[in-house]
Amino acid sequence: MSRTAIYPGTFDPLTNGHLDIVTRAAHMFDSVILAIAASPGKQPLFTLEERVAMAREVTAHLTNVEVHGFSELMAHFAQRQGANILVRGLRAVSDFEYELQLANMNRHLMPTLESVFLMPAEAWSFISSSLVKEVARHGGDVDAFLPEQVARALMTRLRDA
């Protein structure tokens, strides 16, 4: 039986912390879908298409990882993809309460959907896409927190904005 996991998020932009989680998930499961949410309510800096393209570029070396955009309920997307494992990253205890609520709602919507929580490597445990964008907006160096291609795209987007 093949085990397909989904690692969902907005990934605006995809950080080294996200890359750490998807890489580790790729070693744990037969296949992983990096599912990029449209998330229009969050007003992403990058379009869904741009986020999907960047994610495909930085995960190209992970042969069992596919990247898809989605705009429906996660449980419905998981069902459509034939996946019953949801991978989520936990950086701090403060993430846990929200993730617990999401896991319970997803299980209510799809009883066979299990949530698996991974902690990022310590080097990435304090990073969030929002924090990285804020640092970059104020002229800080974010190269250590993002894959090279993503850092370039972020700096170009902010410069051209």
From Swiss-Prot:
Keyword terms of this UniProt record: ATP-binding, Coenzyme A biosynthesis, Cytoplasm, Magnesium, Nucleotide-binding, Nucleotidyltransferase, Transferase
Assembly, per entry: Homohexamer.
UniProt name for this protein: Phosphopantetheine adenylyltransferase
Pathway assigned to this chain's UniProt record: Cofactor biosynthesis; coenzyme A biosynthesis; CoA from (R)-pantothenate: step 4/5
Cofactor section: Mg(2+)
SUPFAM superfamilies for the chain: Nucleotidylyl transferase
GO biological process entries: coenzyme A biosynthetic process
Main location: cytoplasm
UniProt GO molecular function: ATP binding; pantetheine-phosphate adenylyltransferase activity
Keyword Flavoprotein: no
Membership in a protein family: Belongs to the bacterial CoaD family.
Catalytic activity: (R)-4'-phosphopantetheine + ATP + H(+) = 3'-dephospho-CoA + diphosphate
